[in-house]
């Protein structure tokens, strides 16, 4: 591997166990991290604003809940597990002014630091600890004595605590050392994560799925078949990719499918590459971040419009019917 990788045997769990951790936010990621840390014998408190709907849940699960300001003042390590677009207003008001030299503030995504939404005071460490998966998977894998890959990065050193040692120890406490903890930078994590979401995992995949579905519908094929071929079977391919890689996927599909994939890739390849380069450029030059923060400042008009319109599409209407048996089994 090009990146340095660390495992449980390389990391001292005692580093994070000796410190008081405060987690700001108690969504799926905050909850999973708090539970994993506690099960790893780490002292954890939760910071939430007054009136938060998560207060009762956190208390029910046995955590001490403080206001954000109080949490910052009483913690050695503060993890900001809030949505990216809220970092500036929350951290500037309730976190940054109360940080002291020697403390460490951590993030699960490099967005707000890389795009200068927050400025970390001198002497305060700034670390990234990013599990490569959602909170639900982070918790599930930990309970199975397994873990997710984690990324760590150091943006700024602490005047008191070794930031890298703290980041590694924190990742180990969440189960990351069981799988592997890779060291990168805020810039690389942020830009590659945004690119993956936009060009492949969310934007790219959704675009291909919806365009494929609509192409078959316009050609007169039944909605059910269009959904099966363009949406439903994505999971089968994704699972093969996840566990066996591209070559393994090729080995598990028919010659017809493999040859068809090669032929289809030829006309699509150049177009996709050019589009992806444009997407990456807008991420790198800050244009996407600017657009996203403007969207937030206007109360998400485009997101709200898109979400409402999506419910009325044929792909969602037939999908709801065909997914019903699977949801019922759960």
Swiss-Prot record:
Cystine bridges: none
GO CC aspect terms: cytosol
Protein residues bound to Mg(2+) 1: 193, 197
One GO BP annotation of this record: L-valine biosynthetic process
Active site feature: 109
Record's keyword terms, sorted: Amino-acid biosynthesis, Branched-chain amino acid biosynthesis, Magnesium, Metal-binding, NADP, Oxidoreductase
Chain segments annotated as transmembrane: none
InterPro entries: 6-PGluconate_DH-like_C_sf (IPR008927), KARI (IPR013023), KARI_C (IPR000506), KARI_N (IPR013116), KARI_prok (IPR014359), NAD(P)-bd_dom_sf (IPR036291)
Similarity remark: Belongs to the ketol-acid reductoisomerase family.
Protein name per its UniProtKB record: Ketol-acid reductoisomerase (NADP(+))
Organism encoding this protein: Helicobacter pylori (strain P12)
Gene that this sequence comes from: ilvC
